[in-house]
């Protein structure tokens, strides 16, 4: 089914944001919530139940119930402290009722002990930071003769309030003890570092069988990852093998090194030595360099083996702190900083984002009317998670977060997920709904982009719109002068990546390991950011449909060939009259646009959205369902139908044939150029022609003004009448006849 282009477009919205930027320190943390709509809550901070010393209430297990309109929250699922205290804040939408009812019950008998009502309009104060929190007090509940008072505080506040991240919201009152999984949180993932173990050589190695020459390979283990060298024979084997691991700060792990002797062809193996080195004992490389090669005595296996000399292993052990460990695909990278902080570039600016809400969300479970959704935003090593809005397809979050930005050529990633951790009986994995990515290169400084972004999900059944995510984005420059204007010209990656580059295979292998380490680190937080969420946020981009998309780009270049064969003289004159004045005025037009854009039109909102979804470019207007099914197929393939596999094999052969033909043609042209430069061939006339053409070109180059040379491509593109010829020119014929190596195949 053809996709509707307008359905997947980005729409500008006009939310009632919290106000203008105002005066504040751009170097400090963001405290104003001016990128979100203000949400007013009724906060109830329940501290404890206090016994009346004059009355003995007898055995009692107190429970507090708070009711506003149709919403009810209770402390029955909260642990009770030794002094009957809870210290829990409850939050209600103030528009859901006019009277707040607080009831103290006995859990054992389910009877009401005390009860009190508050009128929202007259009896509850309003408080906003930086005002201090309202002190709790003993509220005069009725029936205090039963022996209890209730210590609590009540006030009106917004999402700016410091209790917002820990409050128990009324829409999540049914999630009981799993309420912690619904709270907003900011996570700082530990920074990652490469650990390079270079196995140089072994010395005086002895096999367990003294009559046999050892065939040894070395394994190194850090955490759950084990790498090994090739097998090398002899008592003094040589490897010169780099084993690279990924470790997270504070670099407290241990590398376990084993020397394993392969006894026979049946791969019987025996450990002949071992060694342990802590990461803190390795050489920290903070500049592009190499660690010194040192000899290390190994512990001989089996234990108790006595010998007059020690076997040694020559190694280079270092923590490469000058590299940036990639955890994201390079196309979606949000950070390029190395591990060591001294090599970081200067702070460029502040990225601020307001997560307003979503509309029209669609979940994987069609039987469920609402969705328990939350948003995760990732930039650099800082992750932000909004609170979970329970059972709603149009959630409102209105939460604002900020990041320090060191490089503008980066991408902000936001994912929206269905929370499956809020009920004890439903402890499944969180389900991804979709993602939105925003390139900071498209964000102009000091503008507020308030847009509704389509949440797109590509599956085996085609492209689906899972709803829309409403965001407000702003970037503010902090750096000034030279630091700001030289930023586009500095190195994108740290210097070590250019001095001692890693291979593409190594980078991808380390990236997969970095994702696992981040999953493990963030899973240990409270509340945990689950593994499936981290993996989905860091998932690399898919490469399917690249062949068809890139061939469209090649076909676009062929469009210019149409200009060489204008259908009539009238069309040629019309194009000539339009193009030539544009070429003359292009410099003035560009300068005028730059000046008006930067200095005069600064008061206008930018027109271009941050994301442009080109369905034609990605072949998603009329997607091939079999290609999509192949893209989301497992590896190895789960398809058992031989005919489908044969069809896919033939299709990939055709796809691979196109670039091979292009590469063959390019190689042939290169061989002809090489033959021309080296004067290969038996025809001496070709050498003479080449010499003559070079002389003529040199004479023309030194005698014809440069502005005339610049007119030649324009004249060739416009295809003036004297230049029209359907037959190839003589120079092309001459070049075509030069020898190639095609005849050898």
Curated annotation (Swiss-Prot):
Function per UniProt: May function as a signaling molecule by regulating the trafficking of other regulators.
One GO cellular component, as annotated: plasma membrane
CDD domains per record: C2D_MCTP_PRT_plant (cd08379)
Transmembrane segments: 568-588, 688-708
InterPro entries recorded: C2_dom (IPR000008), C2_domain_sf (IPR035892), C2D_MCTP_PRT_plant (IPR047255), MCTP_C (IPR013583), QUIRKY-like (IPR047259)
Encoding gene, per UniProt annotation: MCTP13
Named cofactor requirement(s): Ca(2+)
Annotated C2 domain residues: 21-139, 171-293, 326-453
Entry's localization field: Cell membrane; Cytoplasm
Binding site for Ca(2+) 1: 56, 61, 106
Region (Disordered): 1-30
Name this polypeptide is given: Multiple C2 domain and transmembrane region protein 13
Tissues where the protein occurs: Expressed in incipient leaf primordia.
Species this chain originates from: Arabidopsis thaliana
């Amino acid at each position: 089914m053809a996709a509707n282009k307008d359905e997947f477009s980005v729409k500008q919205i006009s939310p009632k944001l919290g106000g203008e930027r105002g005066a504040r320190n751009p170097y400090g943390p963001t405290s104003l919530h001016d990128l979100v709509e203000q949400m007013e809550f009724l906060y109830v901070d329940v501290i404890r139940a206090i016994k009346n010393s004059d009355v003995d209430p007898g055995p009692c297990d107190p429970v507090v119930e708070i009711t506003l309109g149709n919403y009810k929250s209770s402390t029955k699922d909260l642990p009770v402290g030794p002094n009957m205290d809870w210290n829990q804040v409850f939050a209600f939408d103030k528009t859901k009722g006019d009277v707040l009812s607080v009831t103290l019950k006995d859990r054992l008998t389910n009877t009401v002990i005390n009860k009190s009502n508050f009128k929202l309009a007259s009896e509850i104060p309003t408080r906003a930071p930086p005002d201090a929190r309202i002190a709790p007090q003993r509220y005069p509940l009725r029936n205090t003769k039963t022996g209890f008072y209730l210590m609590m505080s009540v006030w009106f506040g917004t999402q700016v309030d410091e209790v917002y991240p820990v409050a128990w919201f009324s829409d999540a009152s049914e999630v009981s003890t799993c309420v912690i999984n619904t709270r907003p949180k900011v996570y700082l993932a530990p920074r990652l570092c490469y650990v390079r173990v270079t196995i140089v050589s072994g010395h005086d190695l002895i096999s367990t069988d003294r009559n046999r020459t050892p065939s040894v390979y070395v394994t190194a283990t850090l955490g759950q990852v084990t790498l090994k060298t090739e097998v090398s024979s002899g008592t003094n084997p040589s490897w010169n093998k780099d084993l690279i691991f990924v470790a997270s700060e504070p670099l407290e792990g241990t590398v376990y090194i084993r020397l394993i002797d392969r006894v026979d062809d049946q791969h019987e193996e025996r450990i002949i030595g071992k060694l342990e080195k802590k990461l803190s004992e390795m050489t920290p490389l903070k500049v592009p360099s190499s660690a010194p090669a040192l000899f290390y005595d190994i512990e001989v296996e089996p234990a108790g083996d006595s010998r007059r000399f020690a076997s040694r292993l020559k190694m280079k052990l270092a923590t490469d702190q000058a590299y940036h460990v990639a955890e994201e695909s390079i196309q979606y990278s949000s950070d390029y900083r190395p591990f060591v902080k001294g090599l970081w570039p200067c702070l460029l600016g502040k990225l601020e984002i307001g997560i307003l809400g979503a509309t029209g969300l669609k979940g994987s479970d069609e039987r469920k009317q609402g969705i328990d959704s939350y948003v995760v935003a990732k930039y650099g090593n800082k992750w932000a998670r909004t609170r979970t809005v329970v059972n709603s397809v149009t959630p409102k979050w209105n939460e604002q977060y900020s990041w320090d930005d060191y490089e503008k050529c980066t991408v902000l990633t936001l994912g929206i997920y269905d929370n499956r951790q809020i009920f004890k009986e439903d402890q499944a994995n969180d389900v991804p709904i979709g993602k939105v990515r925003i390139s900071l290169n498209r964000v102009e400084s000091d503008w507020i982009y308030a847009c509704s972004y389509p949440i797109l999900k590509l599956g085996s059944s085609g492209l689906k719109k899972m709803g829309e995510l409403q965001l407000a984005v702003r970037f503010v420059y902090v750096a000034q002068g030279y630091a700001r204007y030289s930023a586009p010209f500095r190195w994108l990656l740290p210097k070590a990546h250019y001095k001692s580059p890693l291979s593409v295979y190594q980078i991808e292998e380390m990236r997969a390991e970095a994702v696992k380490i981040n999953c493990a680190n963030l899973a240990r937080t409270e509340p945990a950011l689950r593994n499936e969420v981290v993996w989905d946020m860091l998932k690399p981009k898919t490469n399917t449909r690249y062949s068809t998309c890139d061939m469209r780009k090649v076909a676009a270049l062929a469009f210019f060939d149409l200009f060489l064969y204008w259908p009539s003289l009238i069309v040629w004159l019309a194009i000539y009259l339009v193009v030539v004045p544009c070429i003359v005025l292009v410099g003035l037009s560009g300068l005028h646009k730059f000046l008006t854009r930067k200095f005069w039109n600064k008061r206008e909102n930018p027109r271009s959205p941050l994301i442009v979804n080109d369905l034609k470019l990605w072949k998603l207007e009329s997607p091939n369902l079999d290609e999509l099914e192949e893209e989301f197929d497992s590896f190895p393939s789960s398809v058992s139908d031989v005919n489908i596999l044969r069809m896919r094999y033939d299709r990939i052969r055709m796809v691979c044939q196109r670039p091979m033909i292009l590469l063959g043609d390019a190689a042939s042209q290169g061989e002809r150029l090489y033959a021309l430069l080296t004067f290969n061939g038996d025809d001496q006339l070709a050498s003479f022609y080449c010499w003559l053409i070079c002389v003529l070109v040199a004479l023309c180059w030194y005698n014809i003004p440069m502005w005339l040379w610049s007119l030649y491509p324009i004249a060739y593109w416009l295809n003036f009448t004297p230049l029209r010829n359907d037959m190839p020119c003589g120079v092309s014929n001459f070049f075509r006849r030069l020898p190639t190596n095609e005849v050898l195949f």
